[in-house]
């Protein structure tokens, strides 16, 4: 599953990093967010979940386009909540550090604290937000993956100047 997510990320032609060990452990996704922001040299970081194999290049492009139009934190909202993928400017590091100090590990709180902008996906793209966490979900994901129509092959990286990593 991580291989598929990595292939999609690499197909964007943007720099890709996989965070394997958090600087601040046992903080859920916030540990990885802190680690990525602390260690990047880029203006912003686009965060993907390791358990969401259906995210497409088109969805990632939407996030980056939103960021390019209005520099700031961008979150996808679904059913009133935010989650992966999302994009944070590197300047969000101080807010993330404060949240960790307070023991707040929620992405919902992060979106509020960074004054993140939210947008919803059209119905046709919502399947991409599906997480795979159990053997049953894995089996269902495999069936869906076999039926999935590929609109852009993962190996067809487009050439452009990266603005987020």
Predicted regions, residues:
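Intrinsic disorder/low-complexity detector
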Residues: 133-135, 157
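Nucleotide and nucleotide-moiety/phosphate-recognizing core
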Residues: 1-104, 109-128, 135-149
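Hydrophobic helical membrane-anchoring modules
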Residues: 143-165
